[in-house]
Amino acid sequence: MKMIIDGKKVDSLSGETFDVINPATGKVIESVPKATAEDIELAVTAAVKGQKEWAKTSVTQRADILHRFVEIVEQNKEMLAQTLCAENGKPITEARAEIGNISIAFPAFAEHAKHFYGTLIPQGTEAGQETTLQLVTREPIGVVACIIPFNFPCDLYDQKVAPALMMGNAAIVLPSSDNPLTLMKLTDNRKLNIAIIIYQISQKSWCTRQLSIHTCCFGNCKVERHCGLWICSRNGNG
C-alpha cells in the first residue's frame, strides 16, 4: 500500500518500506512506505493548502461528506474488520465492533458540529463593558496532527479526525507502525476531500517528533509517554 499526500498515492521519497506483521502468525501481511522528513514537509504543505479550501465549505457540506464516507465504510465493514483483526491481533468480534463505531462517531460529530455555535456576551455582563456587545465566533485552527496509538486505531481515528474535519481543519494522520493498514484502507474507501487526510507511516518515533514541532501542526493528542514528554519539552521551549 502507499501513503496519500496531496491526493496522490505515493511511496516514500527514500523508497524505504517496512513490513506489517500478523502478531498471531508472525507472517508478513503487507509492506508499507516508511516516511522521511521530506515526506512530512510535503504532507504539511499539502494540508495547509487543502485546509484553506476546506474551511470555506459550509458545516452542512462537511457533514454531507462525512455521511457519504460512512456509507463507504458500511459497504466495506467486513473487509476492514478482517484487516484490523489480522494486523492488530484482536478478536474478530472486537474488530467488527470497532469498525462499527466509525459509523456511530462520524455522524454524531457531523450533527453536533451543526449546532456548535459562537457565543454572544450581552452588554453589562463584564465590568467596564456596560455598552459593549461581544461576539465570539469559532474558527478552524488549521492543520491538526492526529497521532494514533496501536490499541484502538479506528476508535481513536474517528474521535480525532471527525471533529477536526467538521470544524474546518485539515488532519494529518500518523497511524501506529504496528497496524497502519486499516486506516490506509479507510483512505481508499472514502469520499472526503482527498487533500484533507494524509497518511504518514514510520517505524521511528522521530516522525511523531517531526510533526509535533512543526509550526503548522496544533491540537491535543494521547500518545506514548516518551512522545508526550517530547512534545511538552519542545512546546515549553517555544
Predicted regions and their residues:
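N-terminal Rossmann-like NAD(P)+-binding subdomain of aldehyde/semialdehyde dehydrogenases
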Residues: 1-131
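Rossmann-like NAD(P) dinucleotide-binding subdomain of oxidoreductase/dehydrogenase enzymes
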Residues: 118-238
